[in-house]
């Protein structure tokens, strides 16, 4: 149990930190940083992980085409959602971009299993009332946290505009736009849960047939999701780089350092998911989706928020903005814990 908890904490910290290196890139536009991130994260890192941990690509040939097609379509939506997540972080910072996106993802994603079966078909499957109301209570608190975080962002924008003597509504990258982008991204990114639900069982059976540990099946699932989602990301960034005439920025003298920071982002992002899968297997099927789920998500939100504070995202924010941020953070962590307790009631 202790080992599983340590791995879950580590996974949450890695996910919370993954976007931080973006703040240290130089002479890159948003499009340059995130396009490279998606190329490395969605294609290169998953391939290396599959070769090293799955002993090659044989496992993918053992999965039926119908499963792969369903996973691929859902993953395209997830890819769009993650693109919006990166855009939200660029607009409103690490603390808000992360917490609002993850909060929305948890809220919508927790409802999906009640209406989608393991085959990806629509089927109402509500849990017992005690489980249902506990989870709904937790999700309501998560939603309250998202609202407080959004309010904190709007207050912060007003504070910063007052200091700079600007009119808040005239700023190009408005806080409200960033918040909406994070929410829409979170909704679309719930397609990850749909894709994972479809692919989980087939990949576990294939992994067992190959003599691999069951937790390694998640690497196969993530490869399909990441590559499919990466297609959406590559199309978007190719258009964005062209329309904003940003291709030339790749010639900067800071390219080497920037690529180094982006590789760190990619490794943290992918490794966080793999580490959590391992943590869940160590904790067992019951504790994995309760204790592990709570620790992973709570630590990621806490880490991202603290990182944003440390690098000065809230330096010019008033005490009112910070107060709303802290209330939102506490609400989200509390809500995540209650959702996990509700899941545990059904274990």
Residues covered by each model-derived region:
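Polytopic alpha-helical membrane proteins, predominantly small-molecule transporters/carriers
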Residues: 1-347
């Amino acid at each position: 149990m202790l080992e599983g908890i340590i791995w879950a904490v580590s996974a949450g910290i890695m996910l919370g930190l993954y976007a931080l290196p973006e703040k240290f890139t130089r002479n890159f536009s948003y499009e340059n940083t995130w396009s490279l991130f998606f190329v490395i994260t969605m294609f290169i890192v998953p391939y290396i992980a599959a070769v090293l941990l799955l002993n090659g690509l044989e496992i993918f040939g053992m999965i039926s085409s119908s499963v792969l097609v369903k996973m691929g379509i859902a993953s395209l939506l997830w890819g769009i959602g993650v693109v919006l997540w990166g855009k939200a972080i660029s607009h409103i910072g690490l603390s808000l971009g992360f917490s609002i996106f993850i909060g929305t993802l948890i809220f919508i994603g927790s409802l999906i299993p009640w209406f989608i079966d393991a085959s990806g078909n629509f089927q109402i499957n509500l849990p017992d009332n005690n489980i249902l109301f506990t989870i709904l209570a937790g999700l309501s608190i998560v939603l309250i946290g998202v609202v407080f975080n959004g309010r904190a962002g709007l207050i912060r924008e007003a504070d910063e505009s007052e200091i700079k003597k600007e009119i808040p509504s005239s700023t190009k990258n408005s806080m409200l736009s960033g918040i909406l982008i994070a929410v829409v991204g979170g909704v679309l990114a719930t397609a990850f849960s749909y894709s994972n639900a479809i692919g989980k069982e087939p990949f576990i059976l294939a992994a067992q047939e190959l003599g691999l540990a069951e937790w390694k099946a998640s690497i196969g699932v993530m490869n399909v999701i990441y590559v499919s989602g990466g297609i959406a990301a590559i199309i978007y960034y190719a258009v964005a780089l062209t329309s904003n005439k940003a291709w030339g920025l790749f010639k900067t003298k800071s390219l080497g350092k920037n690529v180094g920071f982006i590789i760190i982002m990619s490794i943290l992002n992918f490794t966080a998911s793999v580490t959590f899968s391992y943590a869940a297997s160590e904790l067992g099927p019951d504790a994995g989706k309760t204790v592990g789920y709570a620790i992973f998500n709570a630590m990621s939100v806490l880490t991202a928020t603290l990182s944003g504070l440390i690098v000065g995202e809230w330096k010019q924010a008033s005490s009112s903005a910070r107060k709303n941020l802290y209330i939102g953070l506490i609400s989200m962590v509390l809500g995540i814990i209650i959702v996990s307790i509700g899941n545990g009631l059904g274990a």
